[in-house]
Structure formats: structure tokens, C-alpha cells
Amino acid sequence: MTAATRLGVFSEVGKLRKVMVCRPGLAHLRLTPGNCEELLYDDVIWVQQAKRDHYDFISKMQDRGVEVVDMHDLLAQTMALPDARQWLLDRKITDENVGVGLADDVRAWMSELSAASLAELLLGGVVGGDLPEDFDSREMALFREFMGRSGFVIPPLPNSIFTRDTSCWIYGGVTLNPMFWPARRQETLLAASIYRFHLDFANADFEVWWGDPEKDHGAATLEGGDVMPVGNGVVLIGMGERTSRQAIALVAQSLFRHGAAERVIVAGLPKLRSAMHLDTVFTFCDRDLVTVFPEVVNRIDTFSIRPGDNGADGRLDIRPEKAPFVDVVGEALGLPRLRTVQTGGDSYEQEREQWDDGNNVVALEPGVVIAYDCNTYTNTLLRKAGVEVITITAGELGRGRGGGHCMTCPIIRDPV
């Protein structure tokens, strides 16, 4: 199988062949001013418009030959398989997640749903009003009395739209990421069921480098927006608000043990919501061109991790880098230097455009990216640098603080 057809991501800008997205849906209809902060959204969204804008995003990728698969559809197809359905429900509908006295009834009810309905509720959440009226246990009566018909039996997962974070393909394998905030951790279990059972993946040749949604990873948290397999045996990993040093070391250890990478470059980021992941301040647009938010990127503390002298024992050689982060990345790729396009405009406009994901672009191939339309200054600078910028509407999709890079989980991408 060639690099173009086997599962795996071998660069940040090589031809994008296959990508997973997750369209807005029931989970976003259940966002309210009262719960959106807990669910990591800054505001509620106009869901119908968000759906239209997301469809446009998908269409523009398909127009360039990208195979786009949606997590809703993959999950529904997975839940049509009896073994997969039982595996997932046994792990998701538990006393710990749903409640003693409720879990058995809820699991039995969900076991009988159609595959499409089950997938919708696994992503969109289950409220008291969804459950059959003949659920008459004492525990159900207490739930209805105190939580009402709109109380969450299973909370929604609106951040599933940001498929980049839940799992990340690094060269010929994938990580199943234990995410930082409790509001997102159940997303990984859904992704694991797809990779384990769906026919696109069940018989494919790939490794799970690290991560297990059935395991407590403690302080080791990882999110895909911090992870970039850039080629030449190099992986960039941001260490900031969401991804911890413990997880980075474990991922590096696994990649080195399997011979999948030779060097992990760690970008130490300030712990800011506006810079929650590396890809909110730094993304690739071409083989030698990146867009950066200088206020953060210029402050990155850079470290390189390589296998220790005796690679077999799992020890790591961790060393600080003296050069700026962008220069270290260019050197690791064998380039004289990386060209940079900074967030555009004056200091006010730069801060606004970074907040609106001006640096969070996704490359479809070298020199072609998708970006939000509202970031006019940054997009103009990218075009002046020779990049083809395809725009999508930001108004609703951007309210969860993620752009095109965040909303895509590349599954097959060529090297450069």
C-alpha cells in the first residue's frame, strides 16, 4: 500500500486524501446560555446557519478531491454492528456515568434504538424527556423530580465538531487522546469504537501509539490541536493549557520504540484559552511557509526529545533549544529557514484575528489552505505570500474557538 492510500498522516501540508469531520447537530441545539461555558463554548450558536457553513466547508474540501467522512455517519455505521454496540454501551452507560438504578434501564433502551438514532444521542446527549415514560424506578422518579425533562442523563458533546483533538494520526498510527476537560473526555471513547470496529479501520494496518479511553491516564493529557507530524521523522507537540509534559513523554517514548519518529519538538506555550493549542498560533501553509501569532510564538520555550543512548530501555534525551521555535522547526525539516506570515493588521486587529482563528488554517495541499473569511488582514498577507486561500464563513462555527485545522482530523495525508 502506498503512502497515498494507507492510513496515516505524513506531513502537515502534503495532499490531503481523507479527513474526518463532525457536523453541528443535536449537541449544539442543547447549548444554552446557562450551560455553554461548562461545555467549553463562549456562546450559543445559530445551529441551522452553522450546519450550512459546515456543509460549505465540506464541499470546498470535496471540490479539491478530499474524501470527507463525518463522525455522525461513521458512528451510526459502527453502531449497526452488534458487537460494537454492546462494546460501546457497556463502557459508556455505567453506574459512574449515568447513575445507580438508571444505567441498566438506559442501556437496555439504547440497545434497541436504530443505529442512526443511537449515534445522534451518543453525540447529542440524552435528557430526561428522551427516556420512555414507562421508566418508573425510584431512581428515575428522583431524577425527574430534581432534574426535570431537560436534565442531562448523558451530557452532549458539542466539541466533537473539533475532530482534530480526540485522536490524531501521526505517521502510520493514531493516538486516542485523554483530553484535559471532563466535558470532552467521552469523545475519545466514541472515536475508539470507530477505529476498533468500523470496516474502514477494523482490518487496516495501523498502530495505536498511545491512549486508552478505558484507562485513567492521571495527569497525562493530550489533545490533537497540539500535535503536528511535519515529516522527516519529526513531530511537533505543544505543551500548554491542554497537553501535559507527562503525555508528551509517553507519546515520544512509544513513537521512538516503534521507530515511527526520530525527534519530538516540544513547544512550551503560555496557558491561555486564546492559545489553548499549538495550532491556534502556528500552522503550516506550504512546505516552507507557516502562519504565526508572534505575541505567543516568540515566547515559546522549545525543547527537543530524542531516544536516549540506549533506545531500547525507553529513556529519553530531552534538551532545551537555544534558537527560536520557528528556526528549530525549519532546521529539523532540513530547510534553510521557514518563511512566516504573521497575523495581520495592527496590534488590535492581530489580537482579534488570532482570537477568530486567523492562524488556524488547514492545508489541502502545498500552498492551498482553508481559512475563515473574517480574518481579512491575515488572509491578504497569505495571498501576498503566494498561498491560495479558500474562505469559509466564521460567524457561527468559530464560537467554539476553532477554525479549519481544529475541525478536521486528517486520516490520510501524503508526505512532502
From Swiss-Prot:
GO terms for cellular component: cytoplasm. The keyword Hydrolase applies. It catalyses: L-arginine + H2O = L-citrulline + NH4(+). One of its GO terms (molecular function) is arginine deiminase activity. HAMAP family: Arg_deiminase. The keyword Hydrolase applies. Gene3D superfamilies: Arginine deiminase (1.10.3930.10), L-arginine/glycine Amidinotransferase, Chain A (3.75.10.10). The active site is at C406. It is found in: Cytoplasm. This is Arginine deiminase. It comes from the Bacteria. It comes from Hahella chejuensis (strain KCTC 2396). Its EC number is 3.5.3.6. The gene is arcA. GO terms for biological process: arginine catabolic process to ornithine; arginine deiminase pathway. InterPro entries: Arg_deiminase. Keywords: Arginine metabolism, Cytoplasm, Hydrolase. Pathway: Amino-acid degradation; L-arginine degradation via ADI pathway; carbamoyl phosphate from L-arginine: step 1/2. It holds the Pfam family ADI. Belongs to the arginine deiminase family.
